[in-house]
Amino acid sequence: MKTMSTKYIYLFSEGNGSMRELLGGKGANLAEMTSMGMPVPRGFTISTEACTQYYADDRTINPEIEGQIMEYITKLEEITGKQFGSMSNPLLVSVRSGARASMPGMMDTILNLGLNDEVVEAFAKKTKNPRFAYDSYRRFIQMYSDVVMEVGKKYFEQLIDEMKEKRGVTQDTELTAKDLKELAEMFKAEYRTKLGEEFPQDPKEQLMGAVKAVFRSWDNPRAIYYRRMNDIPSSWGTAVNVQEMVFGNMGDTSGTGVAFTRNPATGEKKLFGEFLMNAQGEDVVAGVRTPQTIDQLKDVMPEVYDQFVDICHKLEYHYRDMQDMEFTIENKKLFMLQTRNGKRTAAAALKIACDLVDEGMITEQEAVAMIDPKSLDALLHPTFPKEELERAKPIGQGLAASPGAAAGRIVFTADDVVTWVDKGEKVILVRLETSPEDIEGMHFARGILTVRGGMTSHAAVVARGMGTCCVSGCGAIKMDEANKKFELGGKVYKEGDWISLDGSTGNIYGERLHTAEAEISGEFGRIMAWADKFRALQVRTNADTPKDARQAVNFGAEGIGLCRTEHMFFDPDRISAIRQMIVSDTVEQREKALSKLEPMQQADFEAIYEAMKGRPVTIRLLDPPLHEFVPTDPADIEALAKEMKISVEHLTNVIHSLHEFNPMMGHRGCRLDVTFPEIARMQTSAIIKAALAVRSRRPAWQIEPEIMVPLVGEARELAYVKNVIDATAQKLIKEAGSDMHYKVGTMIEIPRAALTADDIAKEAEFFSFGTNDLTQMTFGFSRDDAGKFLASYYDNKIYESDPFSKLDQAGVGRLVQMSCELGRKTRPDIKLGICGEQGGDPSTVEFCHNVGLTYVSCSPFRVPIARLAAAQAAIKAPRAMDK
């Protein structure tokens, strides 16, 4: 509870730019511009603490805060010499929201507050402009009804259209004062019909309604969605800015506009913006009339233009960043309504940062710190040009699981992908959900669309690793796999029809959109070189193929933190050997099948060592449950039985015996190696032989295999598997007469392993946190099923973000921190890494830096994001251990 003496309200002249937390971004910047002596209409800010109190008081404004608002209205009346509700000199205000972080379009604005039936008459006389007065009044009624009382805009738009039709005109500006006065009456009647009460005539009642509406809009669905996407906590709340109105719609010597100090699309150092004469601010943004470019203001009002250019230079120099400004001209007098760091494309962000360094305005560290790591995603993948997106209409939306843009013909199976691609077609693979068997099809598809699965489903994880566009979890699709068609947005799409996916927004289009290839600029290289200079964390990649490994190295990866061996087994040439191994009854049969696989695995590992050129490579032993590899299709079962010379019935029984109720917690990971040590022997042999072979060809490379045992929960389990690995590896190294070293470590992905990490570190030379499984087991929900209920958890503010995309620092993070401390106690030089999907999430990277991890590992296309995030973490909090 706040005490009675809390100050909830600040005049613009009482605040400054450093008070963002209290005054919000807009309020702090208005205060800062006021203190810089800029022409800012006077006003005050109701703090974010008042918003928090509003929610604490069950969505009501308590008497203490209301009293302070009234006190400050009186102060504003004294400063301006105008009065609320006065017939001779009325005070009109705008009410706008402004959170700490800029949230464009999320919160609502009300202009011309203070007008009523009497004041509008006085206003018309005072300004000698009745048309302007009634235009302002009808706008106010419309905005107040929409924003405060939640009566949709469309009803009022309809009345305007009817009026224009009746008068035989096409533009709003062609309506006369008499028409607008009549419209205001019609609007009030509409208000009465919809709400069963009169439109409020008391300006103070209007003001309290508007302030409540801004507080309430902090929790509208748009705002909640934007906050989740941008990691903005709901506890921040929004401030409210109450500001004396200035009018851009007073006639031909008035106007309003928006401008950027540099081009937000390209970063070019040139004023960019537009303005409208005789208009109010909302008109520019709403796109009702076509505005003029900012340079044309030079011809219309040269003095105002010069003053504006001067202010732009001052603001950019003061904030040391590109500014986005709103301004109004009232009877040839310029007023600044807002400035903030402008939103920009990723390419523009890099150019602006480099230019500001070259201009001596910021340091290299500041340049690295000012770029949003997530925005780099857009630079590395194809995109749809803006004009394509403006033209096309989405037919549905799923989750934006892997960025990029793709257009192709619909196919429904992985095999069909290959068939169509062989004919030279571009395809999109549409599945209920993908499985490891679809890997080849996923590899050749331009994009992947799934009905089920979240941001960390199989499809999403694999697609991000390959840099393939993916939209997952589009539950609105009615799938008919048998007949190779689906229904979405009321239309049926068949195999071979064109669709397009936008992996950055999750939008699905029922047509072919053209894509633009990603272009990496020289500025990208400069920023990345600076980032590498400042970061302490190493950045590795999760890669299972030489192609992925090379791609990651191009993006700056310093090694492989996770090479999964199972993906290599789904190749059509190998699947039968692995199936023979799984359904064998005896060790001899198993070893015979494994001996076929060993040279294949060795060749794979050699190719990966070659691609990594001596950088560290961590290879994980077989992890998935065996049932994932066995055939389910009757024809495949028959073929395998024939090949193994056993009956179909016997084989079917073996396959059924592999069925588990909860395979994710079943016979998988190191449990396979304890039951079948010959699997660990074969894989170790392939890893060591591959390393020895590449070392003999490339003596200059430092190759030191890192063998990782998955799903360990008990130190003795690891000791058992490590003995098998050591016996095999040492024998091979000795036979080769080599002095090669290797390391054995484990994945920490079971909570018990985290709690007993001191014991496990006696055996493990490194830990890699498998945060996908660690998150599942700590929360107790499966990532493949969580999508069904997580939405309700977000809506009810139980969770604010997906724990599979962004590490849960309070729970899972605590386990990670504990394991690091326990592991170091036993083995001070233990290497610590993370290889879950969260490894490419900036907030997770910062956490990993702070708890002292050695490296993070993420999919190839996220490597630049992790490099930048690691540098930002080091700039924010340098680590003592790295000095």
Features from the language model and the residues they span:
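Nucleotide/phosphate-binding sheet-loop regions of phosphoryl- and nucleotidyl-transfer enzymes
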Residues: K2-A392, T419, E425-I428, S435-E440, ...
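Short beta->alpha connector loops at strand-helix junctions that form conserved
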Residues: F44, V451-G453, S472-G475, C563, ...
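Long, charged amphipathic helices and adjacent flexible linkers at domain junctions
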Residues: M70, R228-M229, V368-V427, E495, ...
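Conserved alpha/beta-domain cores
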Residues: R96, I520, W530-K883
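Structural motif
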Residues: N241, V411, I428-V430, L449, ...
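Structured functional modules or segments
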Residues: T450-G453, S457-D497, L501-G503
